[in-house]
Amino acid sequence: VFETMTDLYELKAAVLAAKENCDKPIFTTMTFERNGRTFTGVSPACAAVTLTGLGVDALGVNCSLGPDELEPVVSEMSKYTNLPLVIKANAGLPDPNSNEYNIMPDKFAECVCSLLKYGVKVIGGCCGTNPDYIAKIKSEVADREYQPQTKSVDTTVCSSTTVVEINGPRIIGERINPTGKKLFKQALVENNIDYILTQALSQVQGGAEILDVNVGHPEIDEKKMMVRVLKAIQSVCDVPLQIDSTKPEVIEAGLRYYNGKPILNSVNGEEQSLATVLPLVKKYGASVVGLALDENGIPKTAEGRFEIAKRIVERAEAVGIDRKDVYIDCLTLTVSAEQAACRQTLEALHRVKTELGCKTCLGVSNISFGLPNRELVNRTFLTMAMEQGLDLPIIN
């Protein structure tokens, strides 16, 4: 049991430590203020999304406030998880003169019982409670049955403070990537984190709801740089991040040090990629982009890409990853070189949405590489892709 936590990063470390050293059930509870957030700014939604992804057995709230003030917190948590919830509230607040708490056992039990409808399974008391409170709760719930939650939970990713629900198109900012960017490459080599942060802030100000983070460069230690950049961006931006790398050691470092539930970009249909990357996605509770390519490269046909996408989804589900956390990228090829490929990409995207029921992702800007009027080409293709069901365009 990890309780009275205010920092999601610290709680993530505790959960990973437990999972890596034992196989016991894990219960986690955080402490929230009257503003609905922890002392470090964590929302109930971010806590629920992150901890559910990490695979805890129950989560909830302890200490904090009296049970009469906890309904907004418990309700918000319940929206983002079907796990059993835990409530161990204070007996209200202490009187500054007598130091006695202001909620008596009868009222405490009444308030707690009003929260059972949100999927609360574990009930207790924290500051100001005593055996009389627990006895009263027990008598009130003796004839009640636990009401497990079976609702559909939206696909979500989060930072420690902001949840993004993937229930419509969500823009992923593409500029934190050295490909074709001389100044960005120079910033990586010179360890110029300020330049990278400027790019991140610019993307958020331009409307990005998620940021792709790629720091791959042959002249640097990509693993160390990924951790450094993730921490730096999370210190100034509250949007969720997408960790972009092909190297397993970089992927794991990024997933381990990220605060919240990220997207991993990416896994593909190659056996080595499936066997290496998917277990990491499961362990760290992330979502993952699945690229529709394999050992034979990128199929020229929509059918070929769809079959790889289907294989990725099946393998993900085999290791315990819900298909709602798999975002298929049917791959955008440069239209100047592969003019027929655009149609195949859109057809594959449509099939993934309608037949697999998965969210979709595309690097939109690839379509116009080497062409004039890139913005016009990009937005035209983006419109066509969204018409076919694109959820996550990666764009500037």
Sequence positions of predicted segments:
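Domain-level signal for soluble alpha/beta catalytic cores
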Residues: V1-D329, L333-N396
